[in-house]
Structures are given as C-alpha cells and as structure tokens.
C-alpha cells in the first residue's frame, strides 16, 4: 500500500507563481478590475499550464492555457467582472494553476490533458482577495497640484494684498467730465456723418442724371463715409487707455 500511495503522489509545482497564494483585486468594483499572475518556468523543459477557477462566470482569464518554454515567463491577466461588492465574498473564490511537463510532440493540447496521469499533474491554488480603497488611498491619489497652494503659502508668507481699484471723488469727477466731452465729440461726429450721408445721397441723384460722373460720385461716397469708423476707433482707444491708466496707477 505504501508503494502504491507513493506512486500516486503528485510532483511539487515546477512553476514559480507571482503572487504565490493571493490574487488581490482592488475596488471599487463598478468596472472591470484586472490583476496579473506571472508564471515562471525555471526548468529546462517545456511546461503546459491551464488556469481554473471556482467562479468561471465572474472572471475572464487571458491566456487560460498554453505552453511555457524553459526559462520563460508568461503573464496571465485575470479580469474580475463588475459586481455589487459584498465583504462576505472576499474569500470564497479560488483559482488553481495546473501544470504538466510537455511531451516531445505537442499536436493536441486537449489530448495531452486527457491522457495525463494523475501523478504527472502539478497544481497550485490561489484565493481571491477583494480590497476596497480606504480614505488614505483616496488622498494619495489626489493631484499633487491641489496640495501645493497650502505649502506655498507657508513658505512664501502671507499673500500680498490686492491693489485697490477704487477711485476717489476727484478722479471720478474727472472721468465724468471726460465722458461728457467724449459724448459731445461723438454727437458732433454723428452730425457730420449725417451731413456726409445726405451729401452722398445728393451726389447719387446727380449721378443718375449724369451717367459719366457716376463712377466719381460713387467713389466719393465711399470716401466720405469712411472717416467715421476711423475716428470712432481712435476715440475708443483714447477712452480705454484713459480708463486703464486710471486703474493701473
């Protein structure tokens, strides 16, 4: 009986697993959460592997089987599907990595596993651990720039007081007078523009009666109506410059 039990004893796992025992999934679990499992083959022989789980509907494993060459590493991605987190589930799900030394000729992987003897199989079990981020992790994930103003204020001292932009009575009175003056100039220009417009209409009437002079009349109309926008721009620039000068000084 002892010899029979010894013959049925399984070999120790040839692969080196990283992580060796726990697959940790960090929440929140409202989206797919992925963790990686590295399988290293330190031997001088090819090793076939496959990954199994007790909850196949909850996980997607890529690749879930394959062959690892001597001295090579294969990274297996284990993707946990979204679900409503329940702390009581944290230790229920398990994974198993099953391995076997590859035969000389590998033509059908399914046949390799079907024909494998129990004492040729090697396996390792891992449990799933669900972790929810705590408040400290949330603070560490915040952008560093959000914490900079606090440190900067301590090093640089109190912030300088903003410049006052209020105007005293004398400056206000000057601004009002300047506004009235500019309004008067605007009224004058408006009157001149009306006069020029009337003159243009008169010239157009003359042009209709005298066709040879139509070109010069139209040209004159364009010339007499153009000064107003230029003058308005100049006055607006003076007005804005005056205000900016008052606020800055």
UniProtKB/Swiss-Prot annotation:
- Which residues are listed as membrane-spanning? 228-248
SUPFAM superfamilies assigned: PapD-like
What's a single GO CC term here? plasma membrane
Domain MSP stretches = 14-131
Q: Where do the segments described as phosphorylated FFAT motif binding lie? A: 50-53
Q: Where is this site: Involved in binding the phosphorylated serine of the phospho-FFAT motif?
A: 50
Q: What does this protein do?
A: Endoplasmic reticulum (ER)-anchored protein that mediates the formation of contact sites between the ER and endosomes via interaction with FFAT motif-containing proteins such as STARD3 or WDR44. STARD3-VAPA interaction enables cholesterol transfer from the ER to endosomes. Via interaction with WDR44 participates in neosynthesized protein export. In addition, recruited to the plasma membrane through OSBPL3 binding. The OSBPL3-VAPA complex stimulates RRAS signaling which in turn attenuates integrin beta-1 (ITGB1) activation at the cell surface. With OSBPL3, may regulate ER morphology.
User: What does the subunit comment say?
Assistant: Homodimer; disulfide-linked. Heterodimer with VAPB. Interacts with VAMP1, VAMP2, STX1A, BET1, SEC22C and with the C-terminal domain of OCLN. Interacts (via MSP domain) with OSBPL1A (via FFAT motif). Interacts (via MSP domain) with ZFYVE27; may retain ZFYVE27 in the endoplasmic reticulum and regulate its function in cell projections formation. Interacts with OSBP. Interacts (via C-terminus) with RSAD2/viperin (via C-terminus). Interacts with IFITM3. Interacts with OSBPL3 (phosphorylated form). Interacts with KIF5A in a ZFYVE27-dependent manner.
Q: Return the protein name.
A: Vesicle-associated membrane protein-associated protein A
Organism per entry: Rattus norvegicus
